[in-house]
Structure formats: structure tokens, C-alpha cells
């Protein structure tokens, strides 16, 4: 079986060139980066929660995670400016391809009651965003060691100009969209 990067050059590029009539290989849309974000709003009361979220995300990504801080104080949410309220990581290059491979072939099929991903979750510029309700669908996260089940946001940024191009790019990789 080909890894995702090889699959892109050997199968996806020729298929998209044929479908959209690109003359140059560099016109073909490609995945630029994958961003993982975990909002931990309940970390306001307990600093240990943010540490556990960071550890989970680092295990998933295989690289250091950035802790996101509140931009301004909001009394309704009981947060102050500068308090840690989440964490994020941006994957590029080899780590991005490895994560994308695990996402498509291992994690997505493990989602409970899975009937396909929403094909309308594109932003108008060919980038796809999805939410995962449980981080335990990934094999790196051990179920026994999880203190709390958290969700995370996954954004796949592509060089595609339109949603149709982005959708076809992800479909060519075997992304399971709803019919």
C-alpha cells in the first residue's frame, strides 16, 4: 500500500489533472497543512486539565503544542485575559502526511455511529473543517489513561481555489463523505 504522499503524486495528481483539465502539475490542489485545535474552556477552574489536553494533542501530533490564551476577559465565561483556554498545533510536511493517513484509515472508521463526513463543511476556498467528539478514536490515545473525553477541531488547509476542487482532492484520498 502506498503512503499518502506517494498516493498523491502517483494517483491523485493525474486523476485531478484529467478531471479539471490542469495543464501544469503545480496547478493541482494539494494539502498545505493540517491544524488541530482543542478548546478546554473548563481549564479555568483546573490547570491540570490544560496539561492533560496538551499531552493528548502532543501524542496525536508528534510535536510540541502551543497553548492558546484568552484574548480578552469575559465575565460570563469567568475568564481573564491571558488565561490558558486551549491548545493547538499545525502539522506540515511528513508529520502532516502521517497524521492524514491515520485520520483517514484508522481514526475516522472508529467514530461511533459513523455514516460519513459532511461534504458541506468546506469554507468556500477549498479548506475542510471537521470536529471530533472523542479524542479516543485515535490509536495513540490510551483509553485507560484519559482523564476526560474531549473533542478537537481538525482543519485541512488546501491550495484548492474552490470547494469542488477541495472536495475532489479529499475524495481522491478516500475521504469518506456522506452520499
Swiss-Prot record:
Tell me one GO molecular function of this protein: structural constituent of ribosome
Cross-referenced PROSITE patterns: RIBOSOMAL_L5
Matches recorded under Pfam families: Ribosomal_L5, Ribosomal_L5_C
Q: Which GO terms describe its cellular component?
A: ribonucleoprotein complex; ribosome
Q: Which domain of life is it from?
A: Bacteria
Q: Which InterPro entries match?
A: Ribosomal_uL5, Ribosomal_uL5_bac-type, Ribosomal_uL5_C, Ribosomal_uL5_CS, Ribosomal_uL5_dom_sf, Ribosomal_uL5_N
Q: Does the keyword Phosphoprotein apply?
A: no
Keywords, in A-Z order:
Ribonucleoprotein, Ribosomal protein, RNA-binding, rRNA-binding, tRNA-binding
Binding partners and assembly: Part of the 50S ribosomal subunit; part of the 5S rRNA/L5/L18/L25 subcomplex. Contacts the 5S rRNA and the P site tRNA. Forms a bridge to the 30S subunit in the 70S ribosome.
**Stated family:** Belongs to the universal ribosomal protein uL5 family.
Matching entries from HAMAP family are given as: Ribosomal_uL5_B
What role does it play? This is one of the proteins that bind and probably mediate the attachment of the 5S RNA into the large ribosomal subunit, where it forms part of the central protuberance. In the 70S ribosome it contacts protein S13 of the 30S subunit (bridge B1b), connecting the 2 subunits; this bridge is implicated in subunit movement. Contacts the P site tRNA; the 5S rRNA and some of its associated proteins might help stabilize positioning of ribosome-bound tRNAs.
Q: What is this protein called?
A: Large ribosomal subunit protein uL5
Provide the species name. Answer: Marinobacter nauticus (strain ATCC 700491 / DSM 11845 / VT8)
Gene that this sequence comes from:
rplE
Amino acid at each position: 500500500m502506498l503512503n499518502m504522499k506517494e498516493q498523491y503524486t502517483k494517483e491523485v495528481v493525474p486523476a485531478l489533472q484529467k478531471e479539471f483539465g490542469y495543464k501544469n502539475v503545480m496547478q493541482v490542489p494539494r494539502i498545505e497543512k493540517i491544524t488541530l485545535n482543542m478548546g478546554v474552556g473548563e481549564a479555568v477552574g483546573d490547570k491540570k486539565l490544560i496539561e492533560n489536553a496538551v499531552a493528548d494533542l502532543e501524542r496525536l501530533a508528534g510535536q510540541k503544542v502551543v497553548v492558546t490564551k484568552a484574548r480578552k476577559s469575559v465575565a460570563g465565561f469567568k475568564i481573564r485575559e491571558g488565561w490558558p483556554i486551549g491548545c493547538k498545533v499545525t502539522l506540515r510536511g511528513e508529520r502532516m502526511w502521517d497524521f492524514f493517513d491515520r485520520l483517514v484509515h484508522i481514526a475516522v472508521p472508529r467514530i461511533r455511529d459513523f455514516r460519513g463526513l459532511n461534504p458541506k463543511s468546506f469554507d468556500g476556498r477549498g479548506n475542510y473543517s471537521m470536529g471530533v467528539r472523542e479524542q479516543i478514536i485515535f490509536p495513540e490515545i490510551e483509553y485507560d489513561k484519559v482523564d476526560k473525553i474531549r473533542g478537537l477541531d481538525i482543519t485541512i488547509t488546501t491550495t484548492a481555489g474552490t470547494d469542488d476542487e477541495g472536495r475532489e482532492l479529499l475524495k481522491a484520498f478516500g475521504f469518506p463523505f456522506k452520499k
